[in-house]
A protein has these predicted regions:
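Short secondary-structure boundary micro-motifs
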Residues: 11-13, 67-68
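Small-residue-rich helix-interface/hinge motifs
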Residues: 21-78
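Membrane-helix boundary/juxtamembrane motif in polytopic membrane proteins
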Residues: 179-181
């Protein structure tokens, strides 16, 4: 293969990666919101698990699970609200752990496209987890805010328990030129 063919092949694969991430992003957000609504439905806090607000499939803006958290807290159902809020995060964690197991086990190592799909499914779910923690530990609304409020947790506790140690290790050890001076 000559240089021009290699560049063309790389460009095509880059477009496939972008399309895969956009598609998985939309699918994962849809599943995320449905897990909220299904959990609320199973706990008898929602009339239908399909009553979610669907948003934009590309920008992922406007999606909402339709759970009335504002009615749960005054009714003394904070723990229920926290359970409803945390369930999609458990799903993202399960997808990451399961996907990593499949990728590292070698089960699909010779199946290029299945490996590709599994890898990017893991990446998209990991991005969702990082978007929630540590980024939203101090949020007063949304999933993390509902978990903190519902369980009466300090955001500092959630931040410390859910921030992966390796994300801080570079600056803690001052390797790689990250320290001033």
């Amino acid at each position: 293969m000559n240089r021009q063919q290699e560049l063309r092949s790389a460009a095509v694969y880059a477009l496939i990666v972008i399309a895969t991430c956009i598609a998985f992003g939309a699918i994962v957000v849809g599943i995320h919101e449905h897990i909220h609504s299904t959990t609320a439905y199973l706990m008898d806090h929602m009339a239908s698990p399909f009553a979610i607000e669907r948003g934009n499939l590309v920008t992922l803006d406007g999606w909402d699970e339709g759970v009335s958290y504002s009615a749960l807290f005054p009714a003394g159902k904070g723990t229920d609200a926290a359970i409803i809020a945390v369930m999609p995060l458990i799903m993202h964690t399960a997808f990451v752990i399961g996907g990593l197991y499949v990728l590292l086990s070698g089960i699909i190592s010779r199946k290029k496209w299945l490996f590709h799909l599994t890898f990017w499914l893991v990446v998209v779910n990991l991005m969702e987890l990082f978007a929630y923690m540590p980024g939203r530990a101090f949020s007063r609304h949304g999933d993390i805010g509902n978990i903190n409020h519902g369980l009466g947790l300090s955001p500092w506790l959630l931040l410390l328990l859910t921030t992966p140690p390796w994300s801080c290790s570079r600056c803690i050890t001052c390797t790689g030129g990250c320290c001033p001076g």
